């Protein structure tokens, strides 16, 4: 099992470099991703041990802020957030390795994107380790274009159908349900794919699906960035983007399992919270004008079948 984990870790390290270098090609300023490598000390009092590399871009003309973070961590006991649905794993040692990314564009007509690909192994030091993959990608537009959402979902469906025709409808539904702000009665965006506890096939089959899915993220996102990044926008557009980013912050701090897992397990706070947008605003009881561009997004972020 250790060899398989290392194989996935090596893939993730290469994925991180591929994504950051490709995003830099879309960036029109001199802004680049900077690398912040870190390591948790292997001491008895340290709950979470391991290492990682957080790659951050800030202040770009296209990407106002973005993070592509790799980590491999292990601990003596899974935190509550990881065993909420698997009580039998409570107290087991674990290894977790993954890449998580969030890209916050400057232009309000370019959507924010998020992706995550990871593996958990509980009891890796035992004769019967329990493994599962998780991940997916989702899109959060501020001024939505239907063709962008269709392209995003078609890319997701194409990669799923290569492996299992049941994956896309299942993982799309899970994505709509997961990225939902209960207190707002709103979805975070137009969805995409979300899967957790993926071990329904052999390890090698699941490995291949997750790596194919990870490699398709750029195919889904970059064409949208290139199509929208030069659209002119006003301060009104920017203000609405900042207001909607507030929803992103609310979701990450209240509902996101990865954020909660990282904080509960003693993870590296700077890396965990690096996905936050550089700026966001909240307005008391604000409502969009009827028939406005801003009102349109509230119809787009409702679950729907994007592929006819």
Swiss-Prot record:
Family matches, as InterPro entries: Coprogen_oxidase_aer, Coprogen_oxidase_aer_sf
Group of enzyme by EC: oxidoreductase
Important for dimerization: region residues: 248-283
KW Ribonucleoprotein (keyword) present: no
EC number(s) from the headed UniProt entry: 1.3.3.3
Binding site for a divalent metal cation: 104, 114, 153, 183
Protein name, UniProt field: Oxygen-dependent coproporphyrinogen-III oxidase
Organism of provenance: Francisella philomiragia subsp. philomiragia (strain ATCC 25017 / CCUG 19701 / FSC 153 / O#319-036)
Gene name as annotated: hemF
